[in-house]
């Protein structure tokens, strides 16, 4: 990643790119790492989760250059959870949004909420067919401790709905040994397809906090913004 960001490498900073972030709160813009690069559309006060996810995508690392995000000069459109999906046509037209990060689920808890391709899955698949330059990235879920019969523990635990869609990228978490993290959801989904499509480090991810500092968090919520960024 460092070589991709470096001027002597690919120099991929995210400049000129707009990323949508669907999460549970606004991004508090006094956090220096986001100054002048956030379009807030969330009607809720900031929370740790939303700020941390956003920093992984596009934090500038101004307080500490070692802690910048994957696309430190990208513009962020912040919206409440799945409203980033339903609002995507508007944000594509108004802000040229090309990718979204989605660290949430709309599914029921437990095994009844795993693996189903439903009306929500179909909706997002159709939208991505209509907007060929738009990519949606979703956290797989943290249900790796479930046993959903007839599968053994941890399998068939991808969240239903958006995460099961065929055109999105669903992201799982790796542990420090580069094996699937115990908490990370994984397929197959109900129609037999394999998910997630990709995995990344999901333990103790360091990113922005709301009080002008950095902090760690773990989970697939912290992994999908690595891929989206």
What are the functions of these language-model segments?
Residues 50, 117-121, 155, 191, ...:
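Amphipathic alpha-helical segments in well-structured domains
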């Amino acid at each position: 990643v460092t070589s991709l960001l470096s001027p002597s490498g690919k120099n991929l900073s995210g400049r000129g790119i707009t990323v949508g972030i669907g999460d549970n709160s606004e991004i508090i813009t006094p956090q220096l790492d986001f100054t002048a690069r956030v379009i807030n559309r969330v009607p809720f006060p900031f929370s740790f989760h939303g700020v941390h996810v956003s920093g992984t995508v596009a934090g500038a690392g101004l307080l500490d250059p070692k802690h910048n995000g994957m696309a430190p000069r990208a513009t962020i459109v912040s919206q409440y959870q799945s409203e980033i999906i339903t609002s995507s046509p508007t944000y594509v037209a108004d802000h040229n949004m090309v990718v979204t990060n989605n660290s949430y689920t709309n599914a029921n808890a437990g095994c009844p909420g795993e693996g189903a391709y439903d009306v929500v899955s179909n909706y997002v698949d159709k939208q991505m067919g209509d907007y060929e330059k738009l990519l949606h990235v979703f956290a797989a879920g943290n249900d790796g401790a479930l046993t959903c019969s007839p599968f053994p523990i941890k399998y068939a635990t991808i969240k239903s709905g958006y995460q099961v869609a065929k055109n999105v990228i669903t992201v799982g978490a790796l542990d420090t040994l580069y094996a699937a993290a115990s908490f990370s959801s994984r397929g197959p989904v109900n129609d037999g397809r394999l998910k997630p499509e990709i995995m990344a480090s999901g333990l103790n991810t360091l990113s922005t906090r709301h009080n002008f500092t950095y902090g760690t968090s773990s989970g697939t919520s912290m992994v999908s913004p690595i891929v989206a960024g």
